[in-house]
Amino acid sequence: DHDRAPVDIRALFAFTKKNAGEAMEKLKETAGIHGCIILSTCNRLEIWASHEDDQELSLYQCLCQLKNIQDDSYESYFVSRTDREAAEHLFYLAGGLKSQILGEDQILTQIKDALNLAREHFTTDSILEVLFRMAVTAGKKIKTEAPLAHGNPSVIHQAVSHLKEQGYDMHGKICMVIGNGEMGKVAAQTLRDAGANVTVTVRQYRSG
């Protein structure tokens, strides 16, 4: 995640929505794995898997195979969690308590999207279903009851607020947002709401 790996390393292991679906299907074909979910955002890459109790499984090695990476030097950027530690991590994550901006809203949506994508590709199972649903419920409760979840605690909102505090007027400024994914759309809308003239560009052209 953003605490352990710089942005270039995170980009190396990131998945698009399409690639994540294909990767989950391949991962579930691994002997002993009952279900898997890939959570890939700009700030983190996590692979969740339920598997046989007595199975020795290296999700890092599985990830490297999926990415065609043959280099163990990246392993220090990853951490493995199991059982209660893994569940607690997901609950904290869903509440925005492990985000760059404490209490930010996007991660809860990203967790729900990851679960839905796994459902579409038939790679989740009862254990991951219950775990992720409980995490989403906990995340909603935190955002409803905790003061840190109020307002607009996303990175882009904080950036625009900081510019305003420094005396920069966004009205009429020409801004370019690279990427039209979820965060790109949030960035474009936030800048537009602040009065900027916004252009959005994508890295790849896809017809149809």
What are these regions (language model features)?
Residues 1-99:
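A glycine-rich (often HGG/GG-containing) alpha/beta subdomain
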Residues 11, 147, 196:
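Conserved short-loop catalytic and cofactor-binding motifs
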Residues 44, 84, 108, 205-206:
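Alpha-helix N-cap/helix-start and coil->helix boundary motif
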Residues 73-170:
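Glycine/serine-rich phosphate-binding loop and adjoining beta1-alpha1 elements at the start
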Residues 164-208:
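Glycine-rich phosphate/diphosphate-binding loop of Rossmann-like nucleotide-binding domains
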